[in-house]
Amino acid sequence: MSKVGTSDSKNTLYCSFCGKSQHEVRKLIAGPTVFICDECVELCMDIIREENKSSLVKSRDGIPTPKEICKVLDDYVIGQSHAKKVLSVAVHNHYKRLNHQTKHNDVELAKSNILLIGPTGSGKTLLAQTLARILDVPFTMADATTLTEAGYVGEDVENIILKLLQSADYNVERAQRGIVYIDEIDKISRKSDNPSITRDVSGEGVQQALLKIMEGTVASVPPQGGRKHPQQEFLQVDTTNILFICGGAFSGLEKIISARGRSTSIGFAAQVLAPEDRRTGEIFRHVEPEDLLKYGLIPEFVGRLPVVATLEDLDEASLKKILTDPKNALVKQYQRLFEMENIELTFADEALGAVARKAIERKTGARGLRSILESILLETMFDLPGLEGVEEVVISREVVEGTARPLYIYADRSDRTAESSASA
């Protein structure tokens, strides 16, 4: 039990874990010799929930079922039920293959790398990160735009394996069962349909370089990274069992898919739907390998990515959930910032809907939500530290639309006061 010895606060009780006083927390629970505050209790509950999730996915000989994987993905990623199902089945089969490959020699199971296709801000990267976290395997991310063929300025594809090795603390065995996520994979598409006289070192050349490590090869990885230390001893990493997930927005692919759809439907009975009348994510659901070839991926590269998961555009309801539901939701983050000034930040439900609609109009998906909130709250965050007596700030739909200023509630007034009823 923690008490202060000064005469002014000798009766003040303190949390034995975080040291906060009874005046700084909502509740202080007493034990035989200790006190614990409500904040520490919540933290303990979070730790227990995480432990329960890890024990759930480590059941059944270490292979989570697709439903178990999907259930955990639901806790972190809003929407995208189809992509979650595809990923859950693919990852389950991949690790089942690894655990049982030595038991049966009659049938060799091939590796199924995954291609994620979806609009910007739809959750591709978050899905890959969450998968690695719940499976407790080494994980690394690479940006395809920085990769070049060996011998040219830029990163070698072997650097991807080096990053994976580093995330596994140089444990080669663990790294060989890891997950690699390559983002912006659409940016290494072939620059033109016709073979060029000059080498395409950051497009088709990178696709060729990625082929071997994605299918399975023993890569020689320099522990200190690349070309600057030519004399160092190389580590041998077998990439056969590393799961590769490639993601990209594939801007313009929807036009190729729509054009193919129009060419196969002719006559008076053909149902013609203008591309602008269909959302990008809906069109992506009809992607075929031939569309990816036309986009600029080489046939061998498409063949190394047999599992294709398409993500849909996030609708207004999904974006509203993203704003409020996750543990680190944006609204919660800004509310925490305002709490530091002892001010409560409140968003009207219509305001959240207006923010979601703005993100849809800008076609930035979930990634654009922060910039929208930042612009809405900029003036308020600029003014508040210099104002006294403000107890609460209320954001309405009109504030989001730019026709009003935020409402301020002052501690010494019961009515809601606005700095200005309308913006100039």
UniProtKB/Swiss-Prot annotation:
Residues reported to bind ATP: 119-126
UniProt xrefs under SUPFAM superfamilies: Glucocorticoid receptor-like (DNA-binding domain), P-loop containing nucleoside triphosphate hydrolases
SMART domains: AAA, ClpB_D2-small, zf-C4_ClpX
Residues bound to Zn(2+): 15, 18, 37, 40
Gene Ontology biological process: cell division; proteolysis involved in protein catabolic process
Keywords on record: ATP-binding, Chaperone, Metal-binding, Nucleotide-binding, Zinc
Domain spans labelled ClpX-type ZB: 3-56
GO MF entries: ATP binding; ATP hydrolysis activity; ATP-dependent protein folding chaperone; protein dimerization activity; unfolded protein binding; zinc ion binding
Keyword hit for Phosphoprotein: no
InterPro entries: AAA+_ATPase (IPR003593), ATP-dep_Clp_protease_ClpX (IPR050052), ATPase_AAA_core (IPR003959), Clp_ATPase_C (IPR019489), Clp_protease_ATP-bd_su_ClpX (IPR004487), ClpX_bact (IPR046425), P-loop_NTPase (IPR027417), Znf_CppX_C4 (IPR010603)
GO cellular component, one term: HslUV protease complex
Source organism superkingdom: Bacteria
Matches recorded under Pfam families: AAA_2 (PF07724), ClpB_D2-small (PF10431), zf-C4_ClpX (PF06689)
Similarity annotation: Belongs to the ClpX chaperone family.
Function: ATP-dependent specificity component of the Clp protease. It directs the protease to specific substrates. Can perform chaperone functions in the absence of ClpP.
Subunit-structure text: Component of the ClpX-ClpP complex. Forms a hexameric ring that, in the presence of ATP, binds to fourteen ClpP subunits assembled into a disk-like structure with a central cavity, resembling the structure of eukaryotic proteasomes.
Protein's recorded name: ATP-dependent Clp protease ATP-binding subunit ClpX
Natural source organism: Rhodopseudomonas palustris (strain BisA53)
